């Protein structure tokens, strides 16, 4: 089975306090409408952090500061295996303009389970919730 290596940004309102997290609803493909943390594929020669900055600029017209790695999620979809490095991130410039997603929300810790997340992203939710307690 093919493995796809991707990165995801768990964009928070403030990396120290982490009161709200930004999530988007996928705007294309077979997983359209599923809620996820924005990001994308790592291109040849890129570090995960470089890929994440590029993807967020492409998808949201926004510059971010990439923080700590939260986790690497390994998830087997029916047609491929996903390996996803998930990082904390914070907006440094721009206004989170949706270029590929169909919707977006800022979610508090208690709202994280209120959207229909994609399976790989759901596995990350509890770890994010624990980090939002800090």
What are the language-model segments listed below?
Residues 1-21:
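Conserved N-terminal beta-strand and adjoining loop/helix that marks the start
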Residues 11-12, 23, 89-91, 106:
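Conserved hydrophobic "DFG−1" position in protein kinase catalytic cores
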Residues 18-58:
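Conserved Nudix-box catalytic region and its N-terminal flanking loop in Nudix hydrolases
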Residues 48-57, 69, 87, 104:
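Hydrophobic packing within well-folded, soluble alpha/beta domains
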Residues 59-66:
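Short secondary-structure junctions
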Residues 88, 97-128:
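NUDIX/MutT-family hydrolases
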